[in-house]
Amino acid sequence: MRVMAPRTLILLLSGALALTETWAGSHSMRYFYTSVSRPGRGEPRFISVGYVDDTQFVRFDSDAASPRGEPRAPWVEQEGPEYWDRETQKYKRQAQTDRVNLRKLRGYYNQSEDGSHTLQSMYGCDLGPDGRLLRGYSQFAYDGKDYIALNEDLRSWTAADTAAQITQRKLEAARAAEQQRAYLEGLCVESLRRYLENGKETLQRAEPPKTHVTHHPLSDHEATLRCWALGFYPAEITLTWQRDGEDQTQDTELVETRPAGDGTFQKWAAVVVPSGQEQRYTCHMQHEGLPEPLTLRWEPSSQPTIPIVGIVVGLAVLVVLAVLGAVVTAMMCRRKSSGGKGGSCSQAACSNSAQGSDESLITCKA
């Protein structure tokens, strides 16, 4: 199994640049590769997405009408034609490599040719505030499970099972860790620093969160306090609840940070409290965009309670209305198709449009 980091980039490496800039906080660059085999339906589909921090900046899809590396951020559009030609060739070579690797892995695991299988990889680097390498990554997964990964020392590998040990021996014989380390310490760092400079208005901005605390009665005896952080960038943020100054980590419900769809992020943390004791609880928030940590309380006078029962009833009404609308539409379509006037109804064509490594949006067109 060949190394999935692009060898051409490694060969272009001539050494790291002198580091003089100081960055606000740490930054990262990640590439995510996914190859999915589809027996009887052509070659495996290969998709690559690249991120700087929390911003996608490049994408490639082998199923596109004209597969090419495509910019996904304004600050990378300024790269010249040679850059995009290199990116495109890199992805096409990787697609071929993954195609071979999928066949090999199927053999390692004694799997038939009938099923579909998935090979994923991620590689990249983190920079500290001084612009120097904090950590490098090179990780692989097969059918959703860890397969093999480059260790933090960038000199050795960890195999997840006996099949991965076959790959590990081949990588060690080829001195692949040295090549990966050269790329991660050199060109990866150099590229990330260039992107941070070109896109500094976007990538190095700090937008503070919009904050509030909501109150949701559960019963006569308990209520949920939810601390909200909205519209912030970058994604890293800390939310904690305290009772009389003591952390309530064990009793806090904390959701993962989520993209808001406009380049910013959202997050909330909730805690269930005894009714009448709400003022003993405080939400504490830290973010790069805040001049100092925030402490928030629920303010009864400024924010009315939001009964959970009311929310459930409201959602139920919306569901009923949606179902009724679908039934009416179906009846109208049936009537038209059986001889009524006004044209015909066709099924909506739906497709998956991957927006990033962790989510897909379903787009339906009538």
From Swiss-Prot:
Residues 1-24 form the signal peptide. Residues 207-298 are annotated as: Alpha-3. Residues 333-366 are cytoplasmic. Its main location: membrane. Residues 25-308 are extracellular. Residues 209-297 form the Ig-like C1-type domain. It is a single-pass type I membrane protein. It holds the Pfam family MHC_I_C. InterPro entries: Ig-like_dom (IPR007110), Ig-like_dom_sf (IPR036179), Ig-like_fold (IPR013783), Ig_C1-set (IPR003597), MHC_class-I_related (IPR050208), MHC_I-like_Ag-recog (IPR011161), MHC_I-like_Ag-recog_sf (IPR037055), MHC_I/II-like_Ag-recog (IPR011162). Glycans are attached at residue 110. Residues 115-206 are annotated as: Alpha-2. The keyword tRNA processing does not apply. The chain crosses the membrane at residues 309-332. PROSITE patterns: IG_LIKE. Involved in the presentation of foreign antigens to the immune system. Belongs to the MHC class I family. Heterodimer of an alpha chain and a beta chain (beta-2-microglobulin). This is Class I histocompatibility antigen, Gogo-C*0202 alpha chain. It comes from Gorilla gorilla gorilla (Western lowland gorilla).
